[in-house]
């Protein structure tokens, strides 16, 4: 599948090595972020440059297509998650913080929206879910691998000393993930009912695996 995506969609779009939306397409589209969210990083550098360039990025997030005036929170949130997945932690965090201030506490409707002017800024629960996924799947890099197991890649921003997700309800359990900076490494702890079930000091951007024991 990855090879097929590269062969069909991989393209030089202007100055960017990224993806075309369809054969013959010559305009950047915000959905070029999707391969990044799937862990496909062949064209990560060019794709990130394109997404956050003035050709797509606006003060309200990503345009659906360069030259358009319509922006979609959905593609913006996918792009932020994809940026984390590609390891662009500082860029992703800067834009996530900007987006959060602009959309959630700025002079705007206080929630993630579908689109504008298309959709008239309506609130869909899917967009709020995608915002949460920027944190769970982007910042913490959580990916289920089974009914009682997952891998995760914490992306602790350079100016943060720690971060945590608490009361995560997944895999039939409730647990916490804590990430603490320890000089050049990260100490990562997973707790279930205050019992440590996983603890490791690891280099940054290192995938970690957790498997819960049977109840």
Q: Which residues are covered by each model-predicted region?
A:
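Well-ordered alpha-helical segments within folded domains of soluble proteins
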Residues: 26-39, 70-85, 125-138
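Non-catalytic C-terminal accessory modules of carbohydrate-active enzymes
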Residues: 85-215
């Amino acid at each position: 599948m990855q090879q097929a995506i590269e062969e069909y969609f991989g393209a030089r779009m202007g100055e960017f090595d990224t993806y075309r939306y369809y054969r013959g397409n010559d305009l950047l589209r915000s959905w070029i972020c999707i391969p990044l969210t799937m862990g496909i990083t062949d064209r990560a550098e060019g794709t990130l440059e394109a997404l956050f360039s003035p050709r797509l990025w606006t003060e309200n997030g990503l345009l659906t297509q360069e030259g358009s005036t319509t922006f979609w929170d959905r593609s913006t949130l996918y792009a932020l998650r994809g940026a984390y997945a590609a390891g662009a932690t500082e860029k992703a965090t800067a834009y996530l913080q900007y987006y959060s201030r602009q959309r959630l506490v700025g002079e705007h409707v206080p929630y993630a929206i579908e689109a504008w002017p298309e959709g008239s800024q309506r609130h869909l629960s899917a967009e709020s879910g995608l915002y949460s996924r920027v944190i769970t799947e982007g910042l913490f890099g959580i990916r289920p691998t089974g009914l009682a197991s997952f891998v995760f890649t914490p992306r602790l921003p350079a100016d943060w000393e720690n971060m945590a997700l608490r009361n995560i309800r997944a895999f039939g359990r409730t647990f916490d993930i804590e990430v603490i900076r320890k000089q050049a490494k990260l100490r990562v702890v997973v707790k279930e009912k205050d019992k440590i079930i996983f603890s490791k000091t690891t280099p940054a951007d290192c995938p970690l695996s957790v498997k819960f024991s049977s109840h």
